[in-house]
A protein has these predicted regions:
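C-terminal helical cap(s) of enzyme catalytic domains, especially alpha/beta-barrels
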Residues: 238, 242-248
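Core catalytic lobe of class I
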Residues: 1-240
Length: 248
């Protein structure tokens, strides 16, 4: 199967990436399912054991490493999950990525602030008995393959001095996207991939999202003169993504 640019494929991402050439994309930005029981359709179980889930992520990121060009970067949006016990997914992924061969380049704290809503999951209310922290942040973990520098023509950089100064800070304050409005259980805001794409790629670069979902990464690529490749196992979400791109 030939994988073409500016296309979203309704297939499993591991199978899709195995059809890609080595060293064929400049940047990967994605947010894998968090394994918290969300309904992604019958094609995917979001409530596996931790071991099964981490094995799935490892297989996915191994293929990401293979298709990423030397000097390319990958940005992974993830959140820690659970209460009993609390599961530090960001820590598991950091260790996993180093073992695969990626170089850690830092992490961005996505401060979701007031947009996360008035959660009442605080454990023991006003008591030291068993209070629970309410996460109002997620992580964007940044890694690179091989060379620290991504080669490109500086004239094809599309980030302003003001934005560069802001985006290189390790805390980003952004609201969340509405699942109801978008039509997907866990969309990230368009601002997230747009910032990453402008910070880490040149105009004309190829960006891969192995968990394309509602197509937000592809829309960001269209807005910013980048090429995209996406995989999405759910046919309804794939059609939603294609419709969003057509409306741009």
């Amino acid at each position: 199967m030939e994988i073409k640019e500016n296309t979203i494929y309704n297939i499993d991402c591991i199978d899709g990436m195995r059809s890609m050439d080595e060293d064929s994309v400049d940047f990967i930005v994605t947010s894998p399912p968090y394994n918290v029981g969300k309904d992604y359709g019958e094609q995917y179980n979001d409530d596996e054991s931790l071991t099964t889930y981490l094995d799935f992520l490892r297989s996915t990121f191994k293929e990401c490493y293979r298709v990423l060009r030397d000097g390319g970067r990958i940005a992974v949006n993830i959140a820690n999950t659970g209460r009993k016990p609390y599961i530090p997914l960001s820590s598991y992924i950091n260790i996993m990525m180093i073992e695969i061969g990626f170089k850690c380049r830092g992490e961005i704290i996505w401060d979701k602030g007031a947009s996360v809503g008035a959660s009442c999951a605080w454990g023991s209310w006003r008591s030291p008995s068993n209070p629970s922290l309410r996460d109002v942040h997620e992580y964007i973990l940044i890694y690179s393959k091989g060379d620290y520098k991504h080669k490109g023509n500086k004239d094809n950089a599309t980030i302003s001095a003001e934005d560069f100064t802001e985006y290189t800070k390790s805390i980003w304050r952004m609201g969340t996207a509405s699942a109801k409005k978008i039509g997907h259980p866990a969309p990230f805001p368009l601002t997230l991939p747009e910032r990453l794409i402008n910070l880490y790629t040149f105009k004309g670069d190829t960006v891969l999202d192995p968990f394309m979902g509602s197509g937000t990464t592809a829309v960001a690529c269209v807005h910013n003169d980048r090429k995209y490749i996406g995989f999405e196992i759910n046919g309804d979400f794939c059609n939603l993504a294609l419709k969003r791109i057509e409306n741009e």
